[in-house]
């Protein structure tokens, strides 16, 4: 900076850049900040302001307080609030501040005339000259801009558009022309739209009903397709797990670890179906390439067996009544039902940790749980199956003796096949399931 101000306190310069002030207004703002602060304890006699020109001291000013802050020297003095009225409130704060002691030379200042323009610093004179120049220049601009509308049009016609903007204006004009062309082409289409709306209103309701029926049929077909069901993937996963259980059960039966009598009755029907499919080589337990076809075959057999079994049960329920002796003997099973005990059919193939977690639910060990709920239930089912097989055998003997005269050779063959298969599978689960499966062996081919 060519010319700037500095504040001196007790002949010690504040050498930071913040204390170099370029003009009188900047000096005044920082001086008021210093004196209005609560922590300021200073006497104005020790305060001095120096103006520098290229780091050379040029003019010295002193500070005093008479109804406002004053900067003075031997030639001139300046009341800051007269030049900058926004600092009038600051003067009252400084007067009421007890930490500030006034200058003793204040009487010398009162004898001088206030605010002579001749004795202002040069920077203040330059500020006044700049403001006068700006005001005069603004007035001339107003006179030039206040042009009548007729003269304005003449001046616009004289001016020419530069070449840089002519292409842009032409493009905009072509775009507007295109919009006009499009609007002209769309106008004749409006009557066609009205005709279309009238035709749609005249369409009978029967056609709408037909379209609705077609859409409903399509949705029903898509829902009936098993491949589109969300649960189809879950069913295939269950089928894959059943394949693995049959594979492990077969190994255990061949090795003598598991007896066919001890198979869970919930899995006995599935075991028989898997055995038939394995004997016909219709299923591959080592791969899942044709798992969807295998699932379809298995599902058909399973549904037919279940349907036949339900019919037989309904007939038996209508003919027989429940005995109280059987209810008393089934006390253990009833206890398990009352407690809602659920035993998975893959219990014997579960790891030891899962078996322990199942037993802990009922407050028992694994051995106690198996003795109480699994072994007793298996023995009970075996005894019931033996009784049913004996009754069925006696009834079959009676029927054979009565119908021995009307036996055909084809029926003899079928009965011989059934008897062989029943001997092979007599130890498995439920006899009704076995008879249904044996009938399916004779009528289903893969």
Curated annotation (Swiss-Prot):
Residues 198-233, 309-337, 394-431 are annotated as: Disordered. Residues 199-224 have a biased composition (Low complexity). Residues 397-418 have a biased composition (Basic and acidic residues). It comes from the Viruses. Residues 317-333 have a biased composition (Acidic residues). This is Uncharacterized protein L204. It comes from Acanthamoeba polyphaga mimivirus (APMV).
């Amino acid at each position: 900076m060519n010319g700037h101000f500095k504040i001196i306190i007790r002949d010690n310069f504040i050498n930071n850049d913040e204390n170099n002030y370029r003009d009188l207004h900047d000096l005044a703002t920082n001086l008021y900040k210093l004196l209005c602060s609560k922590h300021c304890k200073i006497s104005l006699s020790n305060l001095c302001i120096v103006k520098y020109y290229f780091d050379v001291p040029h003019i010295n000013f002193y500070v005093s307080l008479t109804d406002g802050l004053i900067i003075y020297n031997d030639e001139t003095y300046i009341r800051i609030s007269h030049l900058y009225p926004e600092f009038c409130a600051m003067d009252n704060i400084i007067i009421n501040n007890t930490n500030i002691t006034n200058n003793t030379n204040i009487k010398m200042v009162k004898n001088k005339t206030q605010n002579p323009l001749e004795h202002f610093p040069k920077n203040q004179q330059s500020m006044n000259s700049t403001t006068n120049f700006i005001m005069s220049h603004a007035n001339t601009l107003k006179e030039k801009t206040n042009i009548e509308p007729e003269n304005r049009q003449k001046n616009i016609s004289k001016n020419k558009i530069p070449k840089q903007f002519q292409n842009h204006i032409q493009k905009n004009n072509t775009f507007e022309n295109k919009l006009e062309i499009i609007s002209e082409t769309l106008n004749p289409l409006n009557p066609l739209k009205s005709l279309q709306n009238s035709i749609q209103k005249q369409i009978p309701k029967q056609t709408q009903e037909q379209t609705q029926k077609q859409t409903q049929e399509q949705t029903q077909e898509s829902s009936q397709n098993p491949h589109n069901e969300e649960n189809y993937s879950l069913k295939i996963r269950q089928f894959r797990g059943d394949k693995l259980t049959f594979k492990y059960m077969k190994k255990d039966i061949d090795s003598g670890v598991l007896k066919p009598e001890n198979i869970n009755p919930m899995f006995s029907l599935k075991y028989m179906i898997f055995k038939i499919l394995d004997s016909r080589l219709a299923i591959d337990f080592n791969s899942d390439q044709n798992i969807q076809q295998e699932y379809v075959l298995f599902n058909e057999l399973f549904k037919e067996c279940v349907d036949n079994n339900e019919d037989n049960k309904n007939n038996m329920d209508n003919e027989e009544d429940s005995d109280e002796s059987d209810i008393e003997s089934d006390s253990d099973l009833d206890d398990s039902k009352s407690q809602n005990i659920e035993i998975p059919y893959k219990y014997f193939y579960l790891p030891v940790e899962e078996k322990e977690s199942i037993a802990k639910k009922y407050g028992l060990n694994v051995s106690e749980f198996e003795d109480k709920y699994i072994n007793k239930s298996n023995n009970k089912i075996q005894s019931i199956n033996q009784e049913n097989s004996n009754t069925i055998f006696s009834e079959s003997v009676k029927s054979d003796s009565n119908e021995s005269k009307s036996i055909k050779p084809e029926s003899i063959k079928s009965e011989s096949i059934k008897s062989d298969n029943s001997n092979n599978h007599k130890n498995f689960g439920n006899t009704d399931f076995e008879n249904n499966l044996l009938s399916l062996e004779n009528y289903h081919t893969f």
